[in-house]
Each structure stands twice: as C-alpha cells, then as structure tokens.
Design a protein with these regions (language model features):
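Hydrophobic core of alpha-helical transmembrane segments in multi-pass integral membrane proteins
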Residues: 30-48, 66-71, 183-187, 226-238
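Alpha-helical transmembrane segments in multipass membrane proteins, preferentially the mid-helix core
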Residues: 41-45, 100, 152-169
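Structural signature of hydrophobic alpha-helical transmembrane segments
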Residues: 29-35, 81-93, 116
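Membrane-interface transmembrane-helix boundary segments in multi-pass integral membrane proteins
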Residues: 17-35, 177, 181, 191-233
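Aromatic-anchored segments of alpha-helical transmembrane domains
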Residues: 65-75, 119-131, 179-190
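Membrane-proximal helix-loop-helix units in multi-pass membrane proteins
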Residues: 105-156
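Membrane-interface helix-boundary motifs at transmembrane edges
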Residues: 46-59, 105-113, 163-173
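N-terminal topogenic module of multi-pass integral membrane proteins
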Residues: 1-56
C-alpha cells in the first residue's frame, strides 16, 4: 500500500508506536500553521467586505468543504480496508462539522455560540498540538485531512464574527450544556466500541491529555478538562465582556 493511504494502525506496525512524521514546530508544522493562518485571515477579510449574498455563498462553500473533507477520510479508510469504529466522526471537532451544517441551514444563535466558544479554541489547539503525527509522512490522507479540516473549523466561526455576530457570556450555560450533554453519551459509547472520542478513555497520544495525566495521574486526567474548559471560555469571552462594560460606561 502506498504510504499516502496508511492508517495509524499500519504505521504503528511498520514504524513503531512512538514514530512521528515531523516534529512539533519544525519546518513542516510551522508551514502548515502559516498556510492555515493566511487562509483564515484572507477568507475572513473577503467575507467581511462582501455583500450579504456573497457571504451566504462563502458560508455554504465552507460548509461543503467541511463535509467533503470529512467524507474523504471516511471513504479513504473504507476503500483501503482500514476503517474501524475509531474513524466515526464523533470527536468534538467532527461533531462541530455537523453543527456548522445545521447553522448554515437554520441560522441558529446557539450554534454560532457553541462554534465560537468551543470550536475555535478546540480546533486551534488541535493545529498547535496535533495528535495525528503517527502516520508515515506529512503527505498522507490523514495528515492533510486533519490540518485542512481543523483550519476550516477555525474559519467557519471566525466568518460568523467577521459578519457581525457578537458572542454573549450569557449564553455560556448553553455552550456547557452542549459540551457535557454530548460528552456523557460519548463516554459510554467509547466503553462499548473501545474508542477514544473526546479523548475521554485514553490520555496518551495527545499532548494536552498527556499533560493532564502527568499532573493528575492516569486515573483522574479527565478532571483536567474542567479548568482547561474554564480557561478557554474565560479567554474567548473576555474581549466581549470588556467591550460590554465600555458601552455601559459610555
């Protein structure tokens, strides 16, 4: 099989479980980050300067790219006989692909809020600390898919904000309800399928959860998500809370 199609399992068998195709913040990783940033900033500027009709087309186009990107991985793994339950689109970022689709169709504020508060920091962390490097090289379906889909997941809510949407700290309870309401069934699904969606059943292979494990131990690493989520929400809403106070004073 050509290296381009090889899954994590085949890579582990051929290269060893500790193999990584490129180092964090090495040349390849920095180039991926630079290209992603240029793409997001360029698209956001285009969106902001566009008419309502063009904005709608851009949003639909980004949604279509997200769905095609997700489908490409699923088909690639299935057609090469490498598909397993772990490729179900049930990580938080995968689920956000469908939240993007639902928002594009229905234009719901709760979707926009969840995408702003959870999707932006989650997808950004994934790009900054990728957990998909145990593949043969950067030129593989898994790596290209992972980088592109997370860049698109950052872009979509950035477009919403660039188009005038204003997040509100008052909607944080809705965001938390979505997060914990989806995590609970995922936790039990992981138990039955032997998967690791939301990184709730195995801390290893991901830099963030590995850090939680180093601090809290393997048994309690999940508790690390609580302060991490609180910090992410604080940082995401701080600018809007400060802006709201300025307007009240004025």
């Amino acid at each position: 099989m050509n290296d381009f199609w090889k899954s994590y399992d085949i890579t582990h068998a051929e290269y060893g479980a500790d193999y990584r195709c490129y180092p964090l913040y090495g040349t390849v990783h920095l180039m991926e980050l630079a290209i992603s940033l240029a793409f997001i900033v360029g698209a956001a500027l285009w969106y902001r300067r566009s008419s309502a009709r063009t904005r709608r087309r851009i949003l639909v186009g980004v949604t279509a790219l997200l769905l095609l990107d997700q489908a490409a991985l699923l088909l690639g793994m299935a057609l090469t006989g490498q598909w397993n339950w772990g490729y179900l689109p049930l990580h938080l970022c995968n689920i956000n692909v469908f939240v993007c689709l639902y928002n594009t169709i229905t234009d719901r504020n709760w979707c926009k809020e969840e995408l702003y508060a959870l999707c932006i920091p989650g997808a950004m962390l994934a790009l900054l600390c990728p957990s998909w490097l145990d593949v043969p090289s950067w030129w593989t379906l898994i790596n290209l898919h992972s980088v592109s889909i997370h860049a698109l997941l950052v872009l979509y809510p950035v477009l919403l904000v660039a188009g005038g949407y204003r997040p509100s700290p008052r909607r944080v309870p809705q965001v938390l309800a979505f997060l914990f309401g989806s995590a609970l069934p995922i936790y039990f699904l992981n138990q039955s399928l032997n998967t690791n969606f939301y990184f709730l059943n195995d801390p290893y292979g991901n830099i963030i959860t590995s850090t939680f494990t180093a601090l809290l131990g393997e048994k309690y690493y999940i508790l690390g998500f609580l302060p991490a989520t609180a910090l992410a929400l604080f940082l995401m809403y701080l600018p809007w809370a400060a802006d709201g106070k300025k307007k009240k004073r004025a």
